[in-house]
């Protein structure tokens, strides 16, 4: 069992996807996403083969260990350490913009965590360090910050769901929170799941840079980004694990961010009430007045 004691702070951070790969503010013509995905994988795999992390500290934690992942090169006294390439896991992820492009997304599980695991549109509380492949940090927070997984770079969202938050926590009299048995990991994000050709202008991230994040996953909360009463996990109508492409009324606002999903003039929040005006919490029981199999909040003629 391990613990961490923190005071909560909330920050605006460069991982936030306001500069993500699907925006058009950068005038540099983009590279071919398929070709770039291949180049990115090779670059990341070379990094993983030539670097290691402080796994021995996790195996036998020294007194006062902070459970932070530290990555270093396999040189000098470290040449016989176990390379990251022999310790990471991976998953295949489809590109958000071109569905014929796939990425092999590598991540390291130092600690799984024993609490709840976030869904892809949830709100998480994390500590993190963001680095380039030269291990130069471009962003970090040593205090817990809230990350809306629908608003961070896609690679971070895709890895966070593979971990669990803290198994328990204690609110201390001094206003701090002590977390126990939380997830600890690292992710190695290809540019196509990061910022691609449009990194935040205020950051030190180059175009097409592969990203490394080390993190501690402390808490997770169910997301309802538009506040309509339908948890965002249930706004993924096609069930593909992505929130961006579900737009029932074709108004260019995805359902998870749309307070009137069917654009019938009645807010979604008013179409998921029972006969007593009480909000229904089970999506399987949402009203379907005309019995056509489509719940009223997604049915413009109901």
Set out the residue ranges of the language-model regions:
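C-terminal motif of bacterial Sec signal peptides marking the signal peptidase cleavage site
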Residues: 14-17
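Enrichment for repetitive, rod-forming helical segments
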Residues: 10-12, 48
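Sec-dependent signal peptide recognition
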Residues: 2-9
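Cross-family detector of peptidyl-prolyl cis-trans isomerase
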Residues: 19-302
